[in-house]
Amino acid sequence: MSVLWMVLGLAIGIAVGAAAGYIVCRSRTDRRLAETRADARSIIEDANRQAETLRREAELAAKEAAMRIKDEAEAEVRARRAEISRIEERLDNRDTALDRREVELDERRRRLSETEDELRRREESLAEREQEQLRALEEISGLSRAEAEERLFSRVEAELERRIGRMVRNRISEAEENADLEARRILATTMERLASDLTSESTVKAVELPSDDMKGRVIGREGRNIRAFEAATGVDVIIDDTPETVVLSCFDPVRREVARIAMERLVKDGRIHPGRIEQVVAKVRKEVEKEMKAAGRQALYDAKVSGSMHGDLLRLLGALKYRSSYGQNVLAHSVEVANIAGMMAQELGANVKIARRAALLHDVGKAIDHEAEGTHALIGGRFAKKCGESDEVVRAISAHHHEVEMQTVEDVIVATADAVSAARPGARRETTEVYLERLRNLEDIALSHRGVDKAYAIQAGREIRVMVQPSEVDDRIAAKLAYDISRKIEDELEYPGQIKVTVIRESRVSEVAR
């Protein structure tokens, strides 16, 4: 029974506790719900206030933007109106200027019309005067106008025919020169690059003696020393009345050089007799042989010729050192020709090696032309072939004086280089004299005319400048003077190409300021 009451009491306690807990929780829940609702109302009110604030700010910003856009639009309108006003002003000014220019043009047309009328009247007056003058001239000359014109035209026609013929000849000459223009350019380039030191070797060998008493010792008893010397050297010894001098004569330049050196050593030594003469001559001959080969090797170096060369050919090349032609040393001439030929071959794209070698050896025949028959070109070609030179080199040597037909460009180059070296003013005595004489004649022709003060031949005789006296020669006479000088040069001188005549008339006036 007691257990039942305990269970019942426990159940009642649990029920009462549960009811009390529910009541407590419900009261707390209601309180929290009320607080939450209050917070929600507060948040909503804050949100409404912020929304109102944002709306007002947006309305204010929109009003400000609208005002700014309106101001900008009004400013742009004002600027466009100002620009339109300026354009209208410029157009008005342009219209005014056009109106003013139209007035000026009308005035000019009027003046031009008046001037045209005046010129027409003057032209008619001049035509009438011309007719009067023609009638007067016809009465004075006894010729009609047609007859006078016919005579004048005949004279003019003859003069024009002569001048046209001369112009045709000049044009033909110019055409030929233009055809050779490239060759001339190559030659000019070659000569500009060439600088040669040439020394003319004298062909006369004279040995000075310390005194005339030495002549007797040179002659020897009954002339035995002279006979021994001539037999050993092959040179003629000439002893004449020239004081303190012995002359050696021989067509062979090498033998003449050997004799000169031997004679100088014998005279210096003082011991002159046949045995001593033979000994000295033999020694000198060996020295000269060595010197010839050394000169040949030096020539190979100076001419930039590569490859070996036969000893005999090298010796003959060195022998050209003692040979001269028109005052031009043959060995120096050969080296110069080799350098010219090398540069020309390089310009033309030819074989530089063959051109230089053949040019250096082109005159080697002159060293033995007294020993063999034929010209030096053919002799040199045969000797070069004998010494093992190539066919191209042999043919170029043989053909450089056109005695053998030229077949290659190297043949032409060697012949041209030889002509350039020989024809260069100053290279040979004979050429120099002819060249200077032509310049003197050219200046004399100019000085022979009245009013000429000075005359100078320049550009190697291709131009003459004539200074005239301004008080005697005016501009009109100066033109006629140039024509007269050119005609006289054509009639009296022979020259290649053309000669330009320049007449210079200069007036100078000076005053002193005090």
From Swiss-Prot:
<dbReference type="InterPro" id="IPR004087">
    <property type="entry name" value="KH_dom"/>
</dbReference>
<dbReference type="InterPro" id="IPR017705">
    <property type="entry name" value="Ribonuclease_Y"/>
</dbReference>
<keyword id="KW-0472">Membrane</keyword>
<dbReference type="InterPro" id="IPR036612">
    <property type="entry name" value="KH_dom_type_1_sf"/>
</dbReference>
<keyword id="KW-1133">Transmembrane helix</keyword>
<dbReference type="GO" id="GO:0003723">
    <property type="term" value="F:RNA binding"/>
</dbReference>
<dbReference type="GO" id="GO:0006402">
    <property type="term" value="P:mRNA catabolic process"/>
</dbReference>
<keyword id="KW-0255">Endonuclease</keyword>
<dbReference type="Pfam" id="PF12072">
    <property type="entry name" value="RNase_Y_N"/>
</dbReference>
<dbReference type="InterPro" id="IPR022711">
    <property type="entry name" value="RNase_Y_N"/>
</dbReference>
<keyword id="KW-0812">Transmembrane</keyword>
<dbReference type="InterPro" id="IPR006674">
    <property type="entry name" value="HD_domain"/>
</dbReference>
<feature type="domain" description="KH">
    <location>
        <begin position="203"/>
        <end position="266"/>
    </location>
</feature>
<comment type="function">
    <text>Endoribonuclease that initiates mRNA decay.</text>
</comment>
<dbReference type="InterPro" id="IPR006675">
    <property type="entry name" value="HDIG_dom"/>
</dbReference>
<feature type="transmembrane region" description="Helical">
    <location>
        <begin position="3"/>
        <end position="23"/>
    </location>
</feature>
<dbReference type="InterPro" id="IPR004088">
    <property type="entry name" value="KH_dom_type_1"/>
</dbReference>
<protein>
    <recommendedName>
        <fullName>Ribonuclease Y</fullName>
        <ecNumber>3.1.-.-</ecNumber>
    </recommendedName>
</protein>
<keyword id="KW-0540">Nuclease</keyword>
<dbReference type="InterPro" id="IPR003607">
    <property type="entry name" value="HD/PDEase_dom"/>
</dbReference>
<dbReference type="Pfam" id="PF00013">
    <property type="entry name" value="KH_1"/>
</dbReference>
<keyword id="KW-0378">Hydrolase</keyword>
<feature type="domain" description="HD">
    <location>
        <begin position="330"/>
        <end position="423"/>
    </location>
</feature>
<keyword id="KW-1003">Cell membrane</keyword>
<dbReference type="GO" id="GO:0005886">
    <property type="term" value="C:plasma membrane"/>
</dbReference>
<dbReference type="GO" id="GO:0004521">
    <property type="term" value="F:RNA endonuclease activity"/>
</dbReference>
<keyword id="KW-0694">RNA-binding</keyword>
<dbReference type="Pfam" id="PF01966">
    <property type="entry name" value="HD"/>
</dbReference>
<comment type="similarity">
    <text>Belongs to the RNase Y family.</text>
</comment>
